[in-house]
């Protein structure tokens, strides 16, 4: 998706094309400072480049908002998986012997697999077939009772605005932020990095190009 922001190299609306056209116009103007046609070409190509930068900036913000929405959906998936695991543990404790346990264990395993896709987790045995689930950073997701994640998206997420963080309330009611030290990898961590690091860095690069364009146009 990030590559699509710039356009296919050499395409008419691609950033490299409009930038090269602007650079060529500046060179022509430098060779013929009094030429009206050269000045007009600089203005036209500068406008084209500015328009391209604005379009890209809009795509960056759209992508940040998309990432924010995806974080919310992923948090809801985590909560659903943890609720399934808690329910499975309750059923397992009530089932006599091996009767009906296989289906419940299968459901629990599927929920664990879903969690492993969304977050970096470590599953440990607690005895009597019970399990505990932590993130590799140490956050307790399940230990007899399911933790619950919370997330409030910021919409619209405009340039320069910070996105919301993820909170966690464990099974005993203790709340804490689920920061990057506790959530190191997985789909949610990747979305947070995209929203808070990768895309803002791209926006800063666009801002730097726009500032350089303004300086060049004023010289």
Regions inferred by a protein language model and the residue ranges of each:
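Structural signature of extracellular appendage/secretion-system components
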Residues: 1-219
């Amino acid at each position: 998706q990030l590559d699509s922001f710039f356009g296919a190299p050499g395409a008419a609306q691609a950033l490299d094309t409009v930038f090269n056209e602007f650079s060529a116009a500046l060179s022509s103007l430098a060779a013929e400072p009094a030429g009206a046609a050269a000045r007009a070409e600089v203005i036209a190509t500068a406008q084209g480049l500015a328009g391209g930068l604005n379009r890209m900036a809009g795509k960056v913000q759209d992508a940040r908002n998309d990432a924010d929405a995806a974080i919310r959906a992923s948090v809801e998936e985590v909560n659903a998986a943890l609720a399934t695991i808690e329910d499975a543990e309750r059923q397992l404790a009530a089932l006599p012997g091996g009767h009906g346990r296989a289906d419940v264990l299968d459901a629990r395993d599927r929920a664990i697999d879903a969690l492993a896709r969304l977050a970096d987790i470590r599953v440990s045995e607690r005895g009597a077939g019970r399990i505990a689930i932590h993130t590799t950073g140490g956050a307790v997701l399940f230990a007899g009772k399911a933790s619950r994640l919370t997330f409030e998206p910021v919409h619209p997420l405009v340039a320069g605005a910070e996105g919301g963080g993820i909170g966690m309330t464990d099974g005993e009611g203790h709340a804490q932020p689920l920061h990057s030290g506790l959530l190191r990898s997985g789909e949610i961590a990747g979305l947070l990095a995209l929203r808070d690091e990768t895309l803002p860095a791209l926006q800063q690069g666009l801002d730097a190009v726009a500032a350089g364009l303004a300086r060049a146009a004023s010289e």
